[in-house]
């Protein structure tokens, strides 16, 4: 293999294996009105072009259903196709309407085929259902939850639904708070998942020392606890953030300066290294929730409310704390999906848990979801406008999390027989987790073998 070919292959591997970074997107605005395709497309375009960043090109969805419909596929899908935004699909699993989620998934596969498949990072069955079903969730009036056996049943339904389709290789997981993951009664869900989604918000850990100076340690601790029970499965950061405005939670003050600090200390080490979906791009349109986590204000703009640039020191910290293992990279590559990230990533939980499944009148409406949220922190309370909540992902938050150093760089470079230079390149690039540094090292190893 020629030198130029080696370099090209190494860079291609590095690019394809970089972790996904994006935001959470609900199917409604902060007033409960349904988002349209143009709304999603504007958000995805903004996220890709945020000043000070390399672009946030992935979207985590809470539901497959378009707001205001029974089971029409969410218009975020054609918007993502148009903007080339990768997708962590979500099916809402609380409230007894799962058949409509499955129907929307089937229709989306039929309608979008390869265009959808090439964008799918994975599929999440549920979001914080186990937390809402817990003693703490009930006490916090977090909304309808689901028991672990039902989540496992839903996961199996999704596997059956996608079998033999364009999405047959998509990894399936569940998103919940770290407190739910470490609860042994939920272990069957871990067994059923290909990956675990971690939601964590130190801001809401108000029974602990949770000032901004404590936030990274709290996040890291909760991620580590989640990874400890994950049985070797990847943990993805599916929700975390710090509010730009809102009430003070014990020692946690919601303001722009602290949101920036949290971004620097927690976000920057994750971005590009661990699959991460931040909470949230915008939650103040048209109504500003309390607390508000949006990094842009009420007007959608590529100019954020605070500086999003990450320093070199943050990047260096990332390479030492969130490098996926070679096995997780290989597994991701084998799926043939939008596995731009084979991250064994840190994961935790306790996001703004959408107390979904209820309409404004308090009964399940089976369509668009109302939009308040409560959360998974210790002794959480309903914190946004209504007591119902939703797959909208647009307000409130809670819980705790931890950034955990996950994964290890396990490059495989030797064997009993002399491998070819191309094999060395491929193995080294996989083992070094797709970073540019890994690609450079891979090239050096390959050249040394020539």
Curated annotation (Swiss-Prot):
Topology relative to the lipid bilayer, per the entry, is: Lipid-anchor; GPI-anchor
InterPro entries this protein is in?
Beta-glucan_modifiers, Glyco_hydro_17, Glycoside_hydrolase_SF
Which reaction does this enzyme catalyse, per its entry? Hydrolysis of (1->3)-beta-D-glucosidic linkages in (1->3)-beta-D-glucans
Q: What is this protein called?
A: Probable glucan endo-1,3-beta-glucosidase eglC
Give the record's glycosylation annotations as residue positions. 183, 365, 371
Tell me the organism's taxonomic lineage: Eukaryota, Fungi, Dikarya, Ascomycota, Pezizomycotina
Chief location of this protein within or outside the cell? membrane
What is the recorded function of this protein according to its Swiss-Prot or TrEMBL entry? Glucanases play a role in cell expansion during growth, in cell-cell fusion during mating, and in spore release during sporulation. This enzyme may be involved in beta-glucan degradation and also function biosynthetically as a transglycosylase.
Q: Where is this region: Disordered?
A: 380-420
Q: Which organism is it from?
A: Neosartorya fischeri (strain ATCC 1020 / DSM 3700 / CBS 544.65 / FGSC A1164 / JCM 1740 / NRRL 181 / WB 181) (Aspergillus fischerianus)
Q: Which UniProt keywords apply?
A: Carbohydrate metabolism, Cell membrane, Cell wall, Cell wall biogenesis/degradation, Glycoprotein, GPI-anchor, Hydrolase, Lipoprotein, Membrane, Polysaccharide degradation, Secreted, Signal
Q: How is it modified after translation?
A: The GPI-anchor is attached to the protein in the endoplasmic reticulum and serves to target the protein to the cell surface. There, the glucosamine-inositol phospholipid moiety is cleaved off and the GPI-modified mannoprotein is covalently attached via its lipidless GPI glycan remnant to the 1,6-beta-glucan of the outer cell wall layer.
């Amino acid at each position: 293999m020629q030198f130029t070919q080696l370099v090209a292959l190494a860079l291609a591997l590095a690019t394809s294996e970089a972790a996904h970074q994006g935001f959470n997107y609900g199917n409604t605005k902060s007033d409960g009105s349904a988002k349209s395709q143009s709304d999603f497309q504007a958000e995805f375009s903004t996220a890709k072009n945020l000043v000070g960043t390399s672009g946030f090109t992935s979207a985590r969805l809470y539901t497959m259903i378009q707001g205001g419909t029974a089971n029409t596929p969410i218009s975020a899908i054609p918007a993502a196709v148009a903007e080339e935004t990768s997708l962590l699909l979500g099916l809402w699993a609380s409230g007894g309407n799962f058949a409509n989620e499955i129907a929307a998934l089937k229709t989306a596969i039929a309608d979008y085929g390869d265009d959808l498949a090439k964008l799918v990072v994975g599929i999440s069955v549920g979001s914080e259902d186990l937390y809402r079903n817990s003693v703490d969730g009930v006490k916090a009036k977090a909304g309808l939850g689901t028991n672990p056996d039902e989540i496992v049943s839903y996961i199996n339904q999704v596997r059956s639904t996608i079998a033999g389709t364009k999405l047959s290789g998509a990894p399936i997981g569940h998103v919940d708070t770290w407190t739910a993951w470490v609860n042994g009664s939920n272990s069957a869900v871990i067994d059923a998942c290909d990956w675990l989604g971690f939601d964590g918000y130190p801001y809401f850990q108000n029974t602990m020392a949770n000032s901004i100076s404590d936030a990274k340690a709290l996040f890291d601790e909760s991620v580590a606890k989640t990874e400890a029970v994950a049985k070797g499965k990847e943990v993805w950061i599916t929700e975390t953030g710090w509010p730009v405005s809102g009430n003070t939670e014990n020692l946690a003050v919601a303001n722009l300066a602290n949101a920036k600090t949290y971004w620097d200390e927690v976000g920057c080490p994750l971005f590009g290294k661990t699959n991460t979906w931040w909470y949230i791009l915008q939650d103040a349109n048209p109504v500003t929730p309390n607390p508000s986590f949006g990094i842009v204000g009420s007007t959608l703009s590529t100019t954020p409310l605070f500086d999003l640039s990450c320093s070199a020191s943050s990047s260096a910290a990332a390479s030492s704390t969130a490098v996926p293992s070679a096995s997780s990279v290989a597994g991701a590559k084998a799926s043939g999906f939008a596995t731009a990230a084979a991250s064994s990533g840190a994961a935790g939980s306790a996001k703004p848990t959408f107390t979904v499944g209820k309409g404004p009148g308090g009964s399940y409406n089976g369509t668009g979801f109302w939009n308040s949220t409560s959360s998974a922190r210790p002794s959480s309370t309903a914190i946004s406008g209504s007591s119902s909540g939703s797959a909208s992902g647009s307000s409130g938050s809670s819980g705790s999390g931890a950034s955990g150093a996950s994964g290890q760089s396990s490059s495989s470079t030797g064997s009993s027989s002399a491998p070819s230079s191309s094999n060395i390149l491929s193995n080294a690039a996989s083992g070094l987790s797709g970073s540019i540094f890994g690609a450079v090292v891979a090239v050096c190893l390959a050249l040394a073998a020539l």
